[in-house]
């Protein structure tokens, strides 16, 4: 993906980000989900559904385009172009060059009774780096599930062992999307493990739990406005133009998570206008360690965003298979893994330039001791890899 982005590509990325933020808002507004730790990858879901759009026609394709890309002439082609560039550049593993470890798995699994179109299979494999497999859902559903799970375990080198939970498919299943993304990066500034101490984290129900908090006296990228503090934690990058960062969005109100997610989804520039660009001196600084492994069936949430036809008998997936009568997406299964701890760069990698701050020193506290939202973004392109929230860091969900 070029460092200088075209206007059309920036617009496509903005649509992709808005899709993810709308999903995050839907998750946060659900009482059950709001009380648990959540993580999902809007970019990998977007890529998977863009592939479905390439195999769809008529009103089904129009609906996919409207939800994923905002509609308009040529938008279906823009979806495909964006997906290809994201898969090739943003989601490529960078660990060989000391960048983040990224493992992306995207699969389309169709019952063996259906004949896949060669053109769709070629598009999926070559342009989307996706797996397209014919499996026997009709007579061997458990074996088919095992086949899908083995695939995701293999693609993610064992980081994600299972994407289809037990009983999630049966002999009526015809088409399943499997989607997983793993990310593990090293901070450019390491947290000193000896400074990690247990303290109280305040839950949404008013109770507290003891959990380990990382702390630091280093300058941090911080911004504060309108009852929201935003922390930017850059990851060590490899030998390419990508720069990944984690953002912690901490509402001042202990119960402000749902309202924050709603603002992010309804105000297009809310996030961009609050991304910190300068390092500041910190006063009290506390960030909990957390580990989230989160899987869910995305159908219900996608329907709330207006994506109905691909999951119904009215679906038109005629560019995907021959004789597609009655074929629709049975399920979209999505799983992610996110881990935040003290790990930083290897010795000496972060030393070098000295930044001189000519303004008056301002110390800003950042104490993430209540529920907060986070995201991981590739900053050059603005592509959001993960969105999630931490409701209880003491639980490895």
From Swiss-Prot:
**Could you tell me which Gene3D superfamilies the record lists for this protein?**
Alpha-1-antitrypsin, domain 1 (2.30.39.10), Antithrombin, subunit I, domain 2 (3.30.497.10)
Highest taxon in the source lineage: Eukaryota
**Stretches that traverse the bilayer:** none
- Which residue ranges does the record annotate as region RCL? 344-368
Q: Has the keyword Amino-acid biosynthesis been applied to this entry?
A: no
Please state which protein family the record places this protein in.
Answer: Belongs to the serpin family.
The protein depicted here goes by the name: Serpin-Z7
* Gene Ontology MF terms in the entry: serine-type endopeptidase inhibitor activity
Positions carrying N-acetylalanine? 2
Q: Which organism is it from?
A: Hordeum vulgare
Q: Sorted alphabetically, which keywords does the UniProt record give? A: Acetylation, Protease inhibitor, Serine protease inhibitor
Q: In which tissues is it expressed?
A: Highly expressed in endosperm, at intermediate level in embryo and at lower levels in roots.
Annotated GO CC locations: extracellular space
């Amino acid at each position: 993906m070029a460092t200088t982005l075209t206007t059309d590509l920036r617009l496509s990325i903005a649509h992709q980000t808005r899709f993810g933020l709308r999903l995050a808002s839907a998750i946060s507004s659900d009482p059950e989900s709001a009380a648990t730790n959540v993580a999902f990858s809007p970019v990998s879901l977007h890529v998977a559904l863009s592939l479905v759009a390439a195999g769809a026609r008529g009103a089904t394709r129009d609906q996919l385009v409207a939800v994923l890309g905002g509609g308009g002439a040529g938008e279906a082609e823009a979806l495909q172009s964006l997906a290809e560039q994201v898969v090739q550049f943003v989601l490529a593993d960078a660990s060989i060059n000391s960048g983040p470890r990224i493992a992306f798995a995207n699969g389309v699994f169709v019952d063996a009774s259906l004949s896949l179109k060669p053109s769709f299979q070629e598009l999926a494999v070559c342009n989307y780096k996706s797996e397209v497999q014919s499996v026997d859902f009709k007579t061997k559903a458990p074996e088919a599930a095992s086949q899908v799970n083995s695939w995701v375990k293999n693609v993610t080198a064992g980081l994600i062992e299972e994407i289809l939970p037990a009983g999630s498919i049966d002999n009526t299943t015809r088409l399943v999307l499997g989607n997983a993304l793993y990310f593990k990066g090293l901070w450019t500034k390491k947290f000193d493990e000896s400074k990690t101490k247990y303290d109280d984290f305040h839950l949404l129900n008013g109770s507290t739990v003891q959990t380990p908090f990382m702390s630091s006296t280093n300058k941090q990228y911080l911004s504060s406005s309108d009852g929201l503090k935003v922390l930017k934690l850059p990851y060590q990058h490899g030998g390419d133009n990508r720069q990944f960062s984690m953002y912690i969005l901490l509402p001042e109100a202990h119960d402000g998570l749902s309202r924050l997610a709603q603002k992010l989804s309804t105000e297009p520039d809310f996030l961009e206008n609050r991304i910190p660009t300068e390092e500041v001196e910190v006063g009290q600084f506390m960030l909990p360690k957390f580990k989230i492994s989160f899987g869910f069936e995305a159908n219900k949430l996608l329907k709330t965003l207006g994506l109905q036809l691909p999951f119904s008998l009215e679906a038109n997936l005629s560019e995907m298979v021959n004789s597609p009568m009655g074929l629709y997406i049975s399920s979209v299964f999505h799983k992610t893994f996110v881990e935040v701890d003290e790990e930083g760069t290897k010795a000496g990698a972060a030393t070098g330039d000295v930044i001189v701050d000519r303004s008056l020193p301002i110390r800003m506290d950042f104490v993430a001791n209540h529920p907060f939202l986070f995201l991981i973004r590739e900053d050059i392109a603005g592509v959001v890899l993960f969105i999630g929230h931490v409701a209880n860091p003491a639980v490895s969900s």
